[in-house]
Every structure is written in structure tokens, then in C-alpha cells.
Amino acid sequence: MRNVIRRVTTMTFTFLLQSPPLPISPSPPQFSLSSSPLSKTQRFITPSQGSRLRTLCTKVIIPNMQDSGSPPLSYLTQREAAEIDETLMGPLGFSIDQLMELAGLSVAASIAEVYKPEEYSRVLAICGPGNNGGDGLVAARHLHHFGYKPFICYPKRTAKPLYTGLVTQLDSLSVPFVSVEDLPDDLSKDFDVIVDAMFGFSFHGAPRPPFDDLIRRLVSLQNYEQTLQKHPVIVSVDIPSGWHVEEGDHEDGGIKPDMLVSLTAPKLCAKRFRGPHHFLGGRFVPPSVAEKYKLELPSYPGTSMCVRIGKPPKVDISAMRVNYVSPELLEEQVETDPTVQFRKWFDEAVAAGLRETNAMALSTANKDKKPSSRMVLLKGFDENGFVWFTNYESKKGSDLSENPSAALLFYWEILNRQVRIEGPVERIPESESENYFHSRPRGSQIGAIVSKQSSVVPGRHVLYDEYEELTKQYSDGSVIPKPKNWGGFRLKPNLFEFWQGQPSRLHDRLQYSLQDVNGNPAWKIHRLAP
């Protein structure tokens, strides 16, 4: 077994490296590097309209039933769970493989929400002979595609085509299958996550070999917690194996999973779950079923395949860290012009699916050197500088009138990248501000008139009332005048720093500084210690 694991772990399984190369448009539509005036040729940045990365799970907090004032949450009996399955696969037309695929994807999405592959890459899925085991096989396949390194222990294989097909799919991905005999004695040394997919809500009686021994081994891992030794986290699919479906772990000697992924709706035993992470998956319950069984369940936001139930665990902020895995940032590989290098990174961030790639932290200081920061949106850039728009009488506008220097910070988490830019700031010509103002949606134009930015208002209703009044005033489509105190700023860079996160905090930092070379300005690249 150790040789199998050793062979597989020599391969690099990170999400970034498994994904296809990020497409970079040779002629990005968001901006231009033309040296012509901004108002004539530089196209402003617009939000990305699509992404090839989809959110599979979004954290939504639903307080526990025990908490006062919490919303109701339904729990199913064993009989109700079976009836719902029969209804789904009967008159409602669902197939078993369809439900299994959705359930397994929900389990994988829940795991990926909490246990990132950079730190929890080695996953052992222990699968039973029934539908719960099938969910585990599907989850393992999705985890492989998410960048994890799954191993499968499937001691009692089912000969039905559905299950043999799932095995074939995993074989085609070279996912290793490990027998019970080949499992290491100490699971804590070879695995970071163990998926308990042995038994589901239809299980009765006591577990039989080899599952009784496997359950005991998972229970024994909990002893590591008492000795503060590192141990794999346990994720149970729908029911912690060995628990009574309704009464839970009534002898208090069973598996105590770190995560429970309830499917369709939580079963009664989930009331006794005390782990830090409880998720709901299986986004396929039709309204007719919810109404018949009076199901009160949290909503799945957006395109999410799972949703958190209960309060998230308390977090030790000092222990929060990410082990970055990224390509190296080398001097010989970057562009000599930092604006061109920024454009390349910006394109890659857009292609990676960031929602607001142009969001940046703008830091200013007033005449007394008192700093202030806020998030704003970059609206254009070229070799002449980086442009954003605001109210000149706002806090940032006031700071820049007193001290016309600023720093910008872009943070693109999904790529482990940051870019810092510093330099003097000036107002852009009024004509450019006028042109951009009238390119905005009419609602935004009216909003700029309504908002005397950073001034005190007695209530939100004041803004709404003025907005409604102006909307009626300009409902005929007439030109909305740009406020005199509204316009753009341009930062002319004299320093860039490109930061790429790396393992063990040995990050790459390349700084471009503008220097005088033979009477001409030139960019000099230095590597900075992390």
C-alpha cells in the first residue's frame, strides 16, 4: 500500500496544474495599451460576463435548532427518507444513477468548501456495497477532478452495471483501489481526509466484517485528538456508519465525524451530530415533495450544490494559513515593461473567472500623512497610468487634493497573486470624465448626482427619495448633466511590485522601479526577499 501511495504522491495534483492553460486573448477587449488620450482610444474595463469556473458550494449560515430564534429545520425518519426516494424514482421520473451523481457531487463540493486540496490532498473513500457506497465512488471521481488524490477501499463490490460503471470510470482516471488488507495500520500517516460512505439510511442491524473493523479503525483515530496528534478528518455521507438512523450514536462509542453531508434532508440522527461542519447536499427536491413532507430546508444560493447547516465553527485566526502552490515568478520570464506584465496577469485573472478583477485597494494620505484605504474599481489603464472615477469632494478626493500620491493593490486570490502600484496622481481632463460619465448606465449617472459622497445623510430614505425624483425628471431620455465635483484620477506609476505566493512563505516578489539611465527613464527589476 505504501508503495502505491508513494507512486501517486510523486505526481503533482493541484487544481491549477490540472486545469487547461488559461486562455489569454491576444487582443483583450477590456483596455488598450495605446499611448493616445484615454478619452479617444482607451476602452474602459467592464466586468467579465462569464467564467469557466463555477461555484459548487456557497456558505450560508443557518443557526442550529437549539439556538433561540433560529429558523426551523426538518429532519427525516428512516421511513420518510425511504418514501421520498421511492417517490423521486417513481412518479417523479428520477433514476438511481442520476440521484447518485448529484449526491456524490454534493459530497465532493462540501469537502472542497472546507478542506482545500493544497492541505488535504490525500483522500481515502471507504465505500459500502449499497447506494451510500455509490455516492462515495462518485464523490471520489469529482474530488480527483478538483485536484485531490483519492484512494478507494471498496471491499464488497456490487455486480450491478451502475456500480461496475462507476469503478470503470475511476479506473480510467488511474484512481487506486486498495484492499482492506493493504490499508496501512495507521491511517493517519497516509491520508488527510477519510470519506465514510459505508452505510446509509436504509442500513439495519450491526455492521459485519470487514466494515465492523473499518469502523473501529475510524473510531480509534479520535484518540489522536486527545494526544494533539495530527489525524485525518472524517467526512460521513448522509449517516455516520454504525449510527442508528434516528437515534444516532446511542452508545457514544461510534464514529464522530468532523463533517456530515446530509443528503435530500437531514435524518433524525443528525440532531446528535456535534462536529464542526454540517452541510446539506442533493439539490433535487421538487416542491411537491417538500410540501408533502413539510420540509423546511435552507435554500441553495446561485449554482451551489451544497449549503452549510448551522453556525460555522469558531476559528483560531492565528492558525489560519494557506500553503500556496504556484508557478515560479522568474526575472527572465517577465516582461521588461511592467504595464505589459500587468496586462498579462490581468488577462489571466479574468480568464480564471474572478468576479471583479478590476477591484483594487486605493490608499491615500492627507496633508497630515494620515492614511486611508478603500476598495474602488479600475476603469482603464495604459502606459500613461491607471484611471478610476469618484466624487472629488469625497475622502479620497480630498486626500488627493492635499497629497497627490497614492498606492493601488490588486489581489487575485485564485491565482495566489498580488500587484502593488505606487505613484503621483492627477485629475484627468474634464472632457475624458464627461465622456466616461455618459457611457455609464443612466441609473448610475443619477446615483452620482444623488450621492454627495462621504457627507452625512439622515437616512437611506433621503437617497431613495431624491433618486426617484431625478429618475422622473429625466424619464424623457434627456441628457443627465455630470456633477461638477465628479471625475477621474490617473496614477502615473513609478513603482510596481508583482507578488506570487509560494510554499513555505518563500514568495516571489519582483519590483520594478523607475530610474534614470543616461538621462532617460528606464524600469529596473529587483527581486525582494519575501
From Swiss-Prot:
Pfam families according to UniProt: PNP_phzG_C, PNPOx_N, YjeF_N
Binding annotation for K(+): N132, D196, S241
Cited InterPro entries: Pyridox_Oxase (IPR000659), Pyridox_Oxase_CS (IPR019740), Pyridox_Oxase_N (IPR011576), Pyridox_Oxase_pln (IPR021198), Pyridoxamine_oxidase_dimer_C (IPR019576), Split_barrel_FMN-bd (IPR012349), YjeF_N_dom (IPR004443), YjeF_N_dom_sf (IPR036652)
Domain named YjeF N-terminal: residues: 81-297
Presence of the UniProt keyword Chloroplast in the record: yes
PROSITE patterns given in the database record: PYRIDOX_OXIDASE, YJEF_N
GO terms of molecular function: FMN binding; metal ion binding; NAD(P)HX epimerase activity; pyridoxamine phosphate oxidase activity
Transit peptide: 1-64
Residue positions binding substrate: R321, V322, N323, Y324
Keyword annotations of the record: Acetylation, Chloroplast, Flavoprotein, FMN, Isomerase, Metal-binding, Multifunctional enzyme, NAD, Nucleotide-binding, Oxidoreductase, Plastid, Potassium, Pyridoxine biosynthesis, Transit peptide
Stated role: Catalyzes the oxidation of either pyridoxine 5'-phosphate (PNP) or pyridoxamine 5'-phosphate (PMP) into pyridoxal 5'-phosphate (PLP). Involved in the PLP salvage pathway. Has a higher preference for PNP over PMP. May also catalyze the epimerization of the S- and R-forms of NAD(P)HX, a damaged form of NAD(P)H that is a result of enzymatic or heat-dependent hydration. This is a prerequisite for the S-specific NAD(P)H-hydrate dehydratase to allow the repair of both epimers of NAD(P)HX.
Protein name per UniProt: Pyridoxine/pyridoxamine 5'-phosphate oxidase 1, chloroplastic
